[in-house]
UniProtKB/Swiss-Prot annotation:
Superkingdom: Bacteria
InterPro entries to which the protein is assigned, alphabetical: A-crystallin/Hsp20_dom, HSP20-like_chaperone, HSP21-like
Family, as annotated: Belongs to the small heat shock protein (HSP20) family.
Keywords: Plasmid, Stress response
Domain sHSP: 88-196
Protein name as catalogued: Small heat shock protein C3
Gene3D superfamilies cross-referenced by the UniProt entry: 2.60.40.790
GO biological process: response to heat
A Pfam cross-reference name: HSP20
Organism of derivation: Rickettsia felis (strain ATCC VR-1525 / URRWXCal2)
Amino acid sequence: MNTYLSEITNLIYYINLKEVCMLYNNIKSYLLSGITVILLTGHPVIAADNVSKPDNKSQTAYLQHPPDLRPFSIFDYYLDNMFEHKLSAYSSSAIRTKFITQDKQYILVLEVPGYDKSQIKVKVNSNKLFITGNVEQNNKSEASDDYTKRNFNYVVSLYEDVDQNNISSNLKNGILTITLPRIEVKEKDAKEIPIQ
């Protein structure tokens, strides 16, 4: 075991990930028995107590092994992201968008299946375009009390050259198309600020 500890201390400043993997494979039986090597999280480097005294008989090495060598690390992704994803197919993240730039206009396309014109609102205010959709269905019957609610909200910052008075929108076959006409914007003169 002391040869492995001395090997760890000799590699303190010259270690890389590949060497850590090889070293871990050499000493993993000792790690599993928990004799002298302590696993910690932190930076992927190796450090040891009393490095300046190599003849010291009681050395403790700290080793962080790569994540792919940790037991149960395959579950980290699923456990970390368990509550971040919504199960609804109609969540706001499920709505696909596309922004098209043309010479005389911008076109914003949103895929909003299942929404009709009365359930979608498009508003413009202070160089921002607000697009909201809301569906509430109450399907009461003798067999069940089903209630469905789904919505989305998008806010788009408009460029300076968008003619906000002539924006138009169209909904057809679950595709919302918003046309943003462009106007010529005169470049403002720069104002020089004197340095005092």
